[in-house]
Every structure is written in C-alpha cells, then in structure tokens.
A protein has these predicted regions:
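N-terminal phosphate-binding or glycine-rich loops at protein starts, especially the Walker A/P-loop
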Residues: 1-33
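Short, solvent-exposed amphipathic alpha-helical segments in soluble enzyme
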Residues: 21-27, 49-53, 104-106
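Short internal beta-strands
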Residues: 31-44
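General beta-strand structural signal in soluble alpha/beta enzymes
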Residues: 35-37, 64-66, 90, 118-122
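Active-site rim loops that border cofactor/substrate pockets in soluble metabolic enzymes
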Residues: 47-75
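Mid-chain, well-packed structural core segment of small domains
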Residues: 68-109
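Short, acidic/small-residue loops that bind anionic groups at enzyme active sites
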Residues: 106-128
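Short, glycine-/small-residue-rich phosphate/pyrophosphate-handling segment
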Residues: 123-155
C-alpha cells in the first residue's frame, strides 16, 4: 500500500465536522502520514476509538504545524510546492471572511496548481478517500506542464 501525505485543515466552524470525518475514516487514515494546522491537529490526535474493549488513539501520530492564522496555512502551502503533500482536506467556512483569507487563497491556489487531490467539503473528501486510486501503488500525480514552462521561461 502506498503511504500518502495528507494535510487536514478546518476553520473553527467546521472543525467538529472534520473530526467526525476523521473518526469515520480512521481505519484508512491511520495508515498514512498526517499533517494538520495547530488546533485542528490537536482535536484529531485526541480522537478515541474502542477496539476489543481497548481505547485507542489511532491518529495521534499526526504532525501538528502552526495554527492557520499564525503561519500553518503557509507551512502546508510550502509543503505542497515542495511535493511533500499528496492530499489536502480543507473544510473551510465560506460564510465569513477569515482574517487570514490571503493565506487561505494562496493555499487553495497551490493545491490546484500542483494538481493534488483537494477537498473543501465532506462529499468530495469521501470521494477522494474511497477512490480506487487513493492508495494505488501505480498511480502518479501529474505535475502540470505549465509549472515547468513557467520555471524555464525566457526573461
């Protein structure tokens, strides 16, 4: 099985929704490398499951970065640009303007630019995690030619 690097981010109003999604999918997520912004990562690391009467914390291996507004979104964006993130699950609150909306915009732009699997809602996240390509050893993400073309442009 291919081990993916998955970034998990949620705005305050959607953190519990992401925690529920992670709880539901803990059996899959526990086999991958997880990264999250500060508080979101703390909540995910505290997810408790009971197997054979024993409490377990299957996602406590998550790597916590800074909180989104203090640089966590940019840390994840840098990881995307460096090819270190395969999937971004970002449950964003689109009903309010975030104080760090420029960081959020930059993060979503990089996810699109570098062609990573990217979900902003539970339905899309469900589609990604249940796709046969999700942990297919033979599948390779294609980096758009436009990136190489831009890097090699004549000035």
């Amino acid at each position: 099985m291919k081990k993916l690097n998955i970034a998990l981010v949620a705005h305050d109003a959607r953190k519990q929704e992401l925690v529920k999604w992670c709880t539901f999918n803990h059996g899959v997520l526990k086999n991958h490398n997880l990264f999250a912004t500060g508080t979101t990562g703390k909540l995910i690391s505290e997810i408790e499951t009971v197997e054979d009467g024993i409490s377990q914390y299957p996602l406590n291996h998550i790597k916590r970065l800074k909180s989104g507004p203090t640089g966590g979104d940019q840390q994840i964006g840098a990881m995307i640009a460096e090819g270190k993130i395969d999937v971004l699950i970002f449950f964003c609150d689109n009903l309010i303007t975030q104080g760090h909306h420029q960081d959020v915009g930059a993060l979503t732009r990089l996810a699109s630019l570098y062609n990573i699997a990217f979900a902003t809602n539970r339905t899309t996240a469900d589609m990604i995690i249940t796709s046969p390509l999700f942990d297919d050893e033979t599948y390779e993400r294609v980096i758009p030619y436009s990136i190489k073309s831009y890097e090699n442009r004549k000035l």
